[in-house]
Design a protein with these regions (language model features):
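Surface-exposed, low-hydrophobicity beta-strand/loop segments enriched in small/polar/acidic residues
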Residues: 1-123
Length: 123
C-alpha cells in the first residue's frame, strides 16, 4: 500500500486573526530565496524592502522576523509575490511554523519575540 504524506496547507498554521484585510499583505520575496513552504518565518531585507527566509546570522535585515508566509512559493530564480501575515492581532500554531534549520534556542526565542512585537502570537 502506498503511503501519502501531506505537506503544509496555505494558512494552515493560522488559529485566529482579527481581520484578514488588516493582518495580511502582499509582499515580494527576493530572488534566490528558493522554495518556501506555508508557515515559513520571513525576514525583511533592509535595502529594497523584499523578504526572504529568516536568516539569524545575516546582517541585511533578514535576521529579524518580520512575518509568516501564507502559501508555498518558488523564488529560486526570480522574485515572487506572496501573501504574508505581517501584523496581528493573530494567533498561530507554533508547531506549524517553519524556522531555519540549525537555529539556536536564542535565535528562535528572538524570532518569537519579534513576531509577538508585531502582534503575532505563537501558541
Amino acid at each position: 500500500m502506498t503511503t501519502l504524506t501531506e505537506g503544509p496547507h496555505p494558512g494552515g498554521f493560522l488559529v485566529w486573526e482579527v481581520l484578514r484585510d488588516y493582518t495580511r499583505e502582499t509582499i515580494t520575496v527576493a530572488s534566490g530565496a528558493g522554495k518556501l513552504a506555508p508557515g515559513t518565518v520571513l525576514g525583511k531585507i533592509t535595502t529594497g524592502g523584499k523578504y526572504t527566509g529568516l536568516a539569524p546570522a545575516a546582517t541585511n535585515g533578514s535576521q529579524n522576523a518580520a512575518g509568516i508566509l501564507w502559501a508555498a512559493i518558488d523564488a529560486t530564480d526570480a522574485d515572487a509575490a506572496s501573501v504574508v501575515i505581517l501584523r496581528g492581532p493573530a494567533i498561530v500554531n507554533r508547531s506549524e511554523i517553519i524556522l531555519p534549520e540549525g537555529a539556536t534556542e536564542a535565535q528562535i526565542n528572538a524570532a518569537i519575540t519579534a513576531l509577538a512585537a508585531l502582534g503575532i502570537i505563537l501558541r
